[in-house]
Amino acid sequence: MIPASMEEAHQLESRSDDLSQRRSYWRWRKQDFFPEFSFQSFSTYKSALSATCPRLADRLLSRSSDAYELDAARRESENPMRRCLTWWDLLWLSFGSVVGSGVFVITGQEARVGAGPAVVLSYAISGVSALLSVLCYAEFGVEIPVAGGSFSYLRVELGDFIAFIAAGNILLEAMVGAAGLGRSWSSYLASLVKNDSDYFRIKVDSFAKGFDLLDPVAVAVLLVANGIAMTGTKRTSWLNLITSMVTVCIIVFIVVVGFTHSKTSNLVPFFPYGAKGVVQSAAVVYWSYTGFDMVANMAEETEKPSRDIPIGLVGSMSMITVVYCLMALALTMMVKYTEIDANAAYSVAFAQIGMKWAKYLVGICALKGMTTSLLVGSLGQARYTTQIARSHMIPPWFALVHPKTGTPIYATLLVTILSSIISFFTSLEVLSSVFSFATLFIFMLVAVALLVRRYYVKDVTPEAGLLKFLGFLFLIIASSIGVSALWNSGVKGWIAYTVTGVIWFIGTLGLALLPKYRVPKVWGVPLVPWLPSFSIAMNLFLIGSLGYVAFLRFIICTMVMLLYYLFVGLHATYDVAHQPLEEAKFEGER
């Protein structure tokens, strides 16, 4: 059930008002951080640790429910978030989050050494892949319109453990990404002012290389962006809308000028690096499409989720794909791909046609793009943290929503402090080595979760049906990994790819022939299981294109998070799931 009606929202608000009258928002008692029975004393904690194995088995097999996420979990915040966003707000929040400085840097690099003029096809391929993930997010956002986004979706369909590991990694990468944006913002501003990207940084020779350039400007930018996010969601949305309009005007200028000074001869040869170059560039430019998942976290603050979320997310991603393709085409038609400056493609291209002043427009657009990405990222990261805190995987104190602003101030402060510390000390070179493995991993898991949601309902799906579903799902995942491994190991010839492709087709066709045990109430992904299955394949293929450093970092971070989960998160969530309160039970009616 979806409590999206005004009456249900009123009921939640009334209960929250009664509770907030008895408690002050500004509090920090031990009970606010660790209210669970396992943490009441050393003896209870020792007893909990001794029961780690059976508790882990319980949480591995336990899933949350729609009802719990929509009602009981939200009450952990004591005050409701305000439903103040429309599809128009979501569309531009997504635009502001996704369209940053990356397109100005990556397009030139990939056109020069990756795909040539065919980089426009790379953007189209990545756009389609991102759109498939958007469709999955949109269906879940309509069905479970809460602040946690993918964390809640995975918790409902795949369970506590997988949701925590995935959420922990993506939250870490989101904070690292915010720190990187802060450092990039500082570099861009310094380049415009003094033509020296390190102009605002403080050199400390006694610190290790990569951590010896302190960046107070990056910290200031993060503090301002997160401070605005704390004052109110609607206010942040309006500011994002205004700045996004500036970006649109500059992009229109770039595209129009590019086409008016274009030469079709610059598009020949169109495939200088072959089909492989197009696909490899698609994996690189895909990062220009990330960020929409932060907007999915705003579902709880959307006025009409069933209408606004599909229009906002799907509409924005479609628009962004067209914008990126036009920008790539304009650049490659304006300048021969062999003459494109990989480091400052658009600025140098305009200089070649006598418009040196246009580099300032590009710089302003990049700065603005990073600013809106920080603003929307601040909103999304805080709400992700809020939902994790509602589950008690981290202290529930971070789930509290301020009664006046309707925003999770404590959660925002947490991500602000952590990302500011990272940005102050860590260089862009170090941050750029942290690839967005978890982002693709979660996109893949959300597609898997959508298939689970359609084909498996507890106590309804027969055991034979479940086994068939798991078998076909295994074929889809295994064949997708196989294609990625073949491609990235440089295997040539069509036989191996044909075999893996046929296996993927058989797995997907098998799912298509199985009966579905749940249908979307209002809006759903079309062509299930084909589109989610293709999304799984695309995301696994892109994961395979990452270097071994990304895999190693993911494994290390996961191991650290696993330690935290075994010593803290596991026992907190176990206590909440088994406390004698109806609203805290996980095994709701499915």
From Swiss-Prot:
Q: Which GO terms describe its molecular function?
A: transmembrane transporter activity
Specify the glycosylation sites in chain numbering: 195
Q: Which keywords label this protein? A: Amino-acid transport, Cell membrane, Glycoprotein, Membrane, Transmembrane, Transmembrane helix, Transport
One BP term from GO:
amino acid transport
- Keyword NAD (UniProt): no
Which residue ranges run through the membrane?
A: 86-106, 115-135, 161-181, 210-230, 239-259, 267-287, 311-331, 360-380, 408-428, 430-450, 466-486, 494-514, 523-543, 554-574
Q: Could you list which ranges are Cytoplasmic topological domains?
A: 1-85, 136-160, 231-238, 288-310, 381-407, 451-465, 515-522, 575-590
State where the protein is found.
Cell membrane
* Membrane protein topology class: Multi-pass membrane protein
User: Where does this protein chiefly localize?
Assistant: membrane
> What PANTHER family does its record include?
CATIONIC AMINO ACID TRANSPORTER 8, VACUOLAR, INNER MEMBRANE TRANSPORTER YGJI-RELATED
UniProt lists the family membership as follows:
Belongs to the amino acid-polyamine-organocation (APC) superfamily. Cationic amino acid transporter (CAT) (TC 2.A.3.3) family.
| Stated name of the protein | Cationic amino acid transporter 8, vacuolar
Species for this entry: Arabidopsis thaliana (Mouse-ear cress)
User: Top-down, what is the taxonomic lineage of the species of origin?
Assistant: Eukaryota, Viridiplantae, Streptophyta, Embryophyta, Tracheophyta
